[in-house]
């Protein structure tokens, strides 16, 4: 199917299919043509290199919020908002002002609605609540990165992630992300 995207300069792609109940890999395609050096065909694009996952990482953030007492019915205000970019209130840099893809604000929305519509502002507010990194005073890894690790994502290793992490601002392999969805 990658050939159908050639006019968009797409020459490589990957697919991972996992049985959710067991985590068994049912199919994995790392390249459309193993022998094509022009597209790095011998690199398994399903496993490496890592790529930014975009909004597909948002469920990891919301799962961490559920562990801290939120539910799908929890209300979040989707309104103009600003945050310290690192999540640290003492961060001296310009505030981070997330926007939704549609450029609109939707007022009070449930977590269910925010995730179903992939609203960015509620996702960032959720990460601001959950925190990026773990609280050292808790026995369990409880930040978004800790939750990602518990779900099998090992590629979030930088010490400087900001709140855009929940919008796909970190790198992950397709195999790890797909596996996390099966946990």
For each predicted feature, which ranges?
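Secondary-structure capping and boundary motifs in well-ordered enzyme cores
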Residues: 17-22, 39, 48-54, 103, ...
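Active-site-proximal helix/loop microenvironment
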Residues: 151-183
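Periplasmic/cell-envelope proteins involved in peptidoglycan metabolism and beta-lactam response
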Residues: 1-51, 55-56, 73-74, 139-150, ...
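Active-site-proximal alpha-helical segments within enzyme catalytic domains
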Residues: 1, 20-26, 59-67, 122, ...
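Conserved catalytic neighborhood of penicillin-recognizing serine enzymes
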Residues: 21, 70-144
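Generic, well-ordered alpha-helical scaffold segments in large soluble proteins
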Residues: 1, 68, 117, 125-129, ...
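Solvent-exposed loop/turn segments at secondary-structure junctions
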Residues: 21-25, 32-36, 52, 81-84, ...
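Active-site SXXK
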Residues: 23, 45, 50-78, 114, ...
């Amino acid at each position: 199917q990658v050939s159908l995207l050639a006019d968009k300069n797409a020459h490589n792609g990957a697919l991972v299919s996992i049985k959710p109940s067991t985590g068994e890999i049912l199919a994995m395609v790392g390249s459309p043509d193993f022998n094509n050096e022009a597209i790095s065909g011998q690199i398994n694009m399903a496993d490496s290199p890592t790529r930014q996952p975009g909004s597909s990482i948002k469920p990891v953030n919301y799962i961490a919020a559920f562990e801290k007492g939120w539910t799908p019915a929890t209300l979040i205000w989707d309104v103009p908002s600003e945050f310290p970019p690192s999540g640290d209130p003492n961060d001296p840099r310009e505030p981070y002002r997330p926007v939704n893809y549609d450029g609109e604000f939707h007022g009070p929305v449930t977590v269910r609605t925010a995730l179903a519509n992939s609203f960015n502002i509620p996702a960032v507010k959720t990460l601001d609540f959950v925190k990026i990194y773990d609280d050292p005073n808790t026995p369990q890894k409880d930040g978004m990165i800790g939750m990602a690790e518990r779900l099998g994502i090992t590629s979030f290793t930088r010490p400087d992630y900001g709140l855009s992490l929940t919008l796909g601002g970190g790198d992950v392999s397709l195999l790890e992300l797909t596996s996390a969805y099966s946990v």
